[in-house]
A protein has these predicted regions:
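Acidic, Ser/Thr- and proline-rich intrinsically disordered linker/docking segments
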Residues: 1-127
Length: 127
């Protein structure tokens, strides 16, 4: 279980490291414009608490590795900037089920800690 470090985003900015166990990552996504940091990291057991870091989504995804890209599904209309891409760690997925006959089709990804995420159909390779 390798640990990797990122710069935690604070308001106001402060130099600090966030060291994460890559085996504990559920998914990552680019931070919304109204949040601090460039990337948001969701970890096992944290519920709605997230970790915002200053590094770009591309760097975070490449550092963690073995993530599967999917488009997030929103029950409400997507944000003005469009639907976000989430990068999911398949090792921490309990199961994936379709939410049919909903239109547009989407999948519910259930993680081993009981949290869930909805992604747009079709389901990406690797899940």
């Amino acid at each position: 279980m390798p640990f990797i470090a990122f710069n935690k985003a604070f308001d106001p900015a402060a130099p600090d490291d966030l060291r994460i166990n890559t085996a504990a990552v559920l998914y990552v996504e680019a931070s919304r414009p109204d949040l601090i940091g460039q990337t948001t990291i969701h970890l096992l057991g944290q519920g709605v608490v997230v970790n915002a870091v200053t590094e770009s989504i591309g760097l975070v995804v490449s550092e963690i590795g073995d993530l599967v890209a999917a488009t997030r599904h929103y029950l409400a209309p997507p944000p003005a900037e469009g639907a976000s891409t989430v990068y999911i760690c398949p090792a921490n997925v309990s199961y994936v089920r379709p939410n049919l006959p909903a239109l547009p089709d989407f999948w519910v990804v259930r993680f081993v800690d009981g949290s869930e995420l909805r992604v747009v159909a079709p389901l990406p390779l690797g899940l």
